[in-house]
Amino acid sequence: MATHHRQNAAGRRKVQVSYVIRDEVEKYNRNGVNALQLDPALNRLFTAGRDSIIRIWSVNQHKDPYIASMEHHTDWVNDIVLCCNGKTLISASSDTTVKVWNAHKGFCMSTLRTHKDYVKALAYAKDKELVASAGLDRQIFLWDVNTLTALTASNNTVTTSSLSGNKDSIYSLAMNQMGTVIVSGSTEKVLRVWDPRTCAKLMKLKGHTDNVKSLLLNRDGTQCLSGSSDGTIRLWSLGQQRCIATYRVHDEGVWALQANEAFTHVYSGGRDRKIYCTDLRSPDIHVLICEENAPVLKMELDRSADPHSAIWVSTTKSTVNKWSLKAVLGLRASGDYENDCSAPLMPLCTQTEQVIKGGASIIQCNILNDKRHILTKDTNNSVAYWDVLKACKVEDLGKTEFDEEIKRRFKMVYVPNWFSVDLKTGMLTITLDESDCFAAWVSAKDAGFTSSDGSDPKLNLGGLLLQALLEYWPRTHINPSDDESEANHTIGENSQLFLTSSSLKCADLATKKHIDAVNGEHESRMQKGNGYFQVPPHTPVIFGEAGGRTLFRLLCRDSGGETESMLLNETVPQWVIDITVDKNMPKFNKIPFYLQPHSSSGAKTLKKDRLSASDMLQVRKVMEHVYEKIINLDSESQTGASSAEKPSEQKEEEDMAVLAEEKIELLCQDQVLDPNMDLRTVKHFIWKSGGDLTLHYRQKST
């Protein structure tokens, strides 16, 4: 369909992989609501969320109004318009796309990818079934809705007209019902006006001193209302090409406007959280309808009755409220306005008529130093504990002290960063990037996984997660050839402690048993998934360019579908293919270090040889090396010990490990090291300096 215009992966910018940790059904708005649309025929309200989800609500069901969610966007949904008598919904998002939805059945029919930045605003000409979209790329595109809804897999081309001339990011857009005039508002602080039929520029209107955030046109396109961050509402005559009235009713920026059909009264809301009704014919006559508990983002008049008896209001919080306008209508009828400017206006309404309850939004997070778990705090001050690897919530901790919980869960262990976290949607979005996705290796035991043979293989967290995310993709079930497996598997080499000088021969610190265990683990990777865990099948997986443009979104469980599988073939970058399809596990990270006798030992300082080992190498292995290759060799040369009778290799190794811990101490910065620590933890928590890590050894005093 027109939805999927993708280039081959090789010709694209760097591709990242993201996924969202969430419930399968997210029933409540999890963040602010940017836009509203009411379908009076079906008594349905559509809300466009900052959590990327469009939800449908029954306005007749006060107790449980939720009907369904429309999910396809990957970032804030900034605007929506209902077209074709409520059958079609168009949405605009910060993921740079415009989407066309079947509003009755709730599925995405097609995706328009003409914008190159956030799409912030839509406008709709009801009489012509024409929609305009605009955003931060300064472009305005015109779309014929009937053409959009007719798109199919074979008929997938769509033509669009564009309106040029905007010099700054566009935040608001309006078009009259007849489709004869379109107006845009931007950070340029001016209104630009076009004729959408010819795409001709008509005029530029100056007057605002800040961003123009909301626009309305009357039916015949002769008058325009604008709301600005400068705190004013202006009424413009397009025939006279000038501002004919300015209304200063708000203390702060005006972000949302609604007007009655006759264009005699305007309802306004914004940063000051107050909603006013102003008589456009008498600038001094205005009433305070109500006061919200957060800045107002959007309003939608209930037009099912004339005059309008209610207004729906959304804010930066997740709850949507319906306020009665009956008291306003009563005032209008009686003409009994209070206009004592010296006294603050009292709101006509203090109780909402209906509430669509919202959910909590995550506003704070801390990645614990095991680089697997995250603590979060939400707008209800509730703390939760999450597992990034398994993409799930582990525990709700309730209203506990966030910082204390972080301290309580601290472990003296260092694992490199291998993912990033984003809270923009109010949910945890985890992003994996080629540059550091494979930086974190841990032992299976430390990760809480057990092997059938009792071994403790080293696991790459990023690699395991990618395999879990694409577990249902048939291409990942294909085994690589044995040759490929052998050529790319270098665990044995990477487990060694290497010297840069030949003056000291160093033993291989990976035993044959360990190598066999790791190779066995490699074989298990050739099965479906990773052999250790699965992520929830409903997890959304997103492939996107590093700059933010989404290339493809799907649910984890859907990657086995024919269409999805084909699109994955086009979209999945090579660095992900290497791990998930070819099963080429990345190499261990190495860490260089120096090993010297401690000053208190009285031993002669060695030639300063630079050693290199896996950063996961435990201190006890270095102690064994010191005991066997330095201390033991010295004592053997002094006593002339015979090596005629040798115990078994395994017994000798075990004895050596015990003797090393009994007789040797390893120090860093004069601090005695725990044999269970690995080198990366020593470097991060104890060395804490630039340059190569330096370790000192000494014999324990008897």
Describe each region flagged by the PLM.
Residues M1-Q37, A41-N60, S324-E353, S503, ...:
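Intrinsically disordered, low-complexity acidic/Ser/Thr/Pro-rich linker and tail segments
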Residues I21-Y28, Y66-H72, C108-T114, A134, ...:
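Short C-terminal beta-strands that terminate individual repeats in beta-propeller domains
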Residues L36-L42, I80-G86, A123-K128, A174-G179, ...:
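Loop/turn segments within WD40 beta-propeller blades
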Residues A48-D51, A92-D95, S133-D137, V145, ...:
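Conserved strand-to-loop turn within each blade of WD40 beta-propeller repeats
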Residues I54-V59, V98-W101, L122, I140-V145, ...:
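WD40-repeat beta-propellers
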Residues A510, V518-T702:
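Extended, C-terminal alpha-helical/coiled-coil scaffolding tails that mediate protein-protein interactions
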